[in-house]
Amino acid sequence: MASRRMETKPVITCLKTLLIIYSFVFWITGVILLAVGVWGKLTLGTYISLIAENSTNAPYVLIGTGTTIVVFGLFGCFATCRGSPWMLKLYAMFLSLVFLAELVAGISGFVFRHEIKDTFLRTYTDAMQTYNGNDERSRAVDHVQRSLSCCGVQNYTNWSTSPYFLEHGIPPSCCMNETDCNPQDLHNLTVAATKVNQKGCYDLVTSFMETNMGIIAGVAFGIAFSQLIGMLLACCLSRFITANQYEMV
């Protein structure tokens, strides 16, 4: 019996070391998600408001998920150091829930990527039709056009169907150089062709999505399946600790 305890102790020590390392990496993942959520709320709010038909809580979901992972990452380290079988089982159960949630989110994002593109087309077209240069969505359109050096949905001529165009012409945010644009030029599509950006914003955004979708999906599934490693380590460690406790009785 004593020899078996001697055999299991090195295994337990090894599993504890691996699980602590994993939990630390898991904790870092939570910090990254939390940072991305805050960054997305502060920086990408204008883009998100145009991609989503209704108000979206995506940044808050990332912040909440990141915070939860940070807490459970610390819990995993504590449970590992404490060597508590029930805590390790609880940690494994949480990792399984995270795995399922990330897997569903990754599959949904990949399957519905075309719906996301269609939604962006509808919302951006609607934002152009209701553009007045002052409200939040109008400022979002201006921000996208300036930051991406684009104009309109497909191209700058899309603005000719907007009520704003009849009074003000193409928005100055379309100009390659706003100091070189005047209202008269922006009222004339022929003259404006030499003053404004030619590429449409829809093509730029969707081409970026298509180009990076494989990378994003690969990273998402990689992170999701990494939870299986943590689940395996936590379950194995819990089993060995329980077995070792029985051997001591």
UniProtKB/Swiss-Prot annotation:
Glycans are attached at N54, N155, N158, N177, N188. The chain crosses the membrane at residues 17-40, 57-75, 87-112, 214-234. Gene3D superfamilies: Tetraspanin (1.10.1450.10). Not solely expressed in T-cells. Expressed in acute myelocytic leukemia cells of some patients. GO terms for cellular component: plasma membrane. InterPro entries: Tetraspanin/Peripherin, Tetraspanin_animals, Tetraspanin_CS, Tetraspanin_EC2_sf, TSN6/7_LEL. PROSITE patterns: TM4_1 (PS00421). It comes from the Eukaryota. It is found in: Membrane. Residues 41-56, 113-213 are extracellular. Residues 1-16, 76-86, 235-249 are cytoplasmic. Keywords: Disease variant, Glycoprotein, Host-virus interaction, Intellectual disability, Membrane, Transmembrane, Transmembrane helix. It is a multi-pass membrane protein. The keyword Membrane applies. It is linked to Intellectual developmental disorder, X-linked 58: A disorder characterized by significantly below average general intellectual functioning associated with impairments in adaptive behavior and manifested during the developmental period. Intellectual deficiency is the only primary symptom of non-syndromic X-linked intellectual disability, while syndromic intellectual disability presents with associated physical, neurological and/or psychiatric manifestations. (Microbial infection) Interacts with herpes simplex virus 1 (HHV-1) UL35. May be involved in cell proliferation and cell motility. Belongs to the tetraspanin (TM4SF) family. This is Tetraspanin-7. The gene is TSPAN7.
